[in-house]
């Protein structure tokens, strides 16, 4: 660190610390996270020697947490240091330091988070299973953006917007998911009325999704857990109010990335 902060001289930005840590790290350590449909993300890194035990667990635990939150999953595989792996496994157990993280992933995938200590032979291979979704410009389509303070809907014919509206709503304060459902249906029907037919619906929404189901979303933060099933099916049910219309729901960040791809004609843009 070139410049020490005067109010907290001991503070080290975490982006700087791993770079210094890895300079003398030479022991391979692998992390994999498994999520729905057998998708597996693998991250390979290195650890220092046993003399740096505290630094090793700090580095490895941060890498596991990063991978879990960036990829999501219900199963973590660790290989390379059984002692470090056991400490991480304990952290994700009930009462452990990462109990919150484990609970979040349970809400996402509805199964307890597992941490598995592997041998090199047992460690899984990466399985990205990429899918092509969205980007359609043909036909008559509805685009819906479910935001936390307003909702936006557009009617699009052959790639051209023929109608668009923005309506203020307050889903974050509603404990009854009927409010979010009714607002979505109203938006769909308004856009549908501007076109001769509806060939498909695309939804951009805050939250994390498995398929079209919002598993964790701030839009439903006040909805009690016992009404969770209503939330999970909310967009599919709303689409059925329009007819037998295909619908795809995605996180708003993923939709923004798709829009960037469509504008630039290439992926991996920042």
PLM feature spans:
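Glycine-rich phosphate-binding loop and adjoining helix at the ATP-binding site
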Residues: 49-61, 65-71, 87-118, 166-182, ...
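Short loop/turn motifs enriched for small/polar and acidic residues
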Residues: 79-81, 204-208
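Gly/Thr-rich phosphate-binding beta-strand-loop-beta motif of the actin/hexokinase/Hsp70
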Residues: 128-162, 269-270
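Short amphipathic alpha-helices and their capping/turn segments at secondary-structure boundaries
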Residues: 138-143, 181-198
């Amino acid at each position: 660190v070139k410049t020490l902060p005067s109010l907290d001289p001991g503070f080290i930005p975490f982006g700087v610390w791993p770079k210094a840590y890895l300079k003398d790290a030479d022991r391979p350590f692998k992390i994999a996270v498994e999520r729905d449909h057998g998708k597996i993300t693998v991250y390979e890194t290195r650890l220092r020697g046993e003399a740096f035990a505290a630094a090793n667990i700090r580095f490895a635990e941060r890498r596991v947490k990063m991978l879990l939150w960036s990829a999501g999953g219900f199963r973590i595989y660790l290989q390379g240091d059984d002692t470090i792996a056991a400490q991480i496994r304990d952290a994700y157990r009930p009462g452990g330091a990462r109990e919150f993280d484990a609970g979040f992933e349970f809400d996402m995938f509805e199964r307890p988070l597992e941490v598995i200590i592997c041998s090199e032979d047992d460690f899984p291979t990466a399985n990205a299973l990429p899918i092509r979704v969205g980007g359609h410009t043909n036909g008559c389509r509805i685009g819906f953006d479910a935001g936390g303070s307003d909702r936006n809907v557009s009617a699009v014919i052959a790639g051209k917007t023929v109608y668009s509206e923005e309506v203020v709503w307050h889903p974050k304060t509603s404990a009854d998911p009927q409010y979010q459902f009714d607002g979505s249906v109203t938006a769909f029907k308004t856009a549908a009325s501007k076109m001769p037919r509806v060939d498909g619906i695309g939804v951009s929404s805050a939250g994390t999704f498995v398929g079209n189901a919002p598993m964790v979303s701030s839009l439903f933060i006040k909805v009690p857990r016992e009404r969770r099933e209503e939330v999970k099916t909310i967009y599919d049910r709303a689409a059925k109010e329009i007819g037998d219309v295909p619908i795809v729901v995605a996180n708003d960040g993923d939709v923004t990335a798709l829009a960037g791809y469509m504008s630039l004609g290439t992926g991996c843009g920042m």
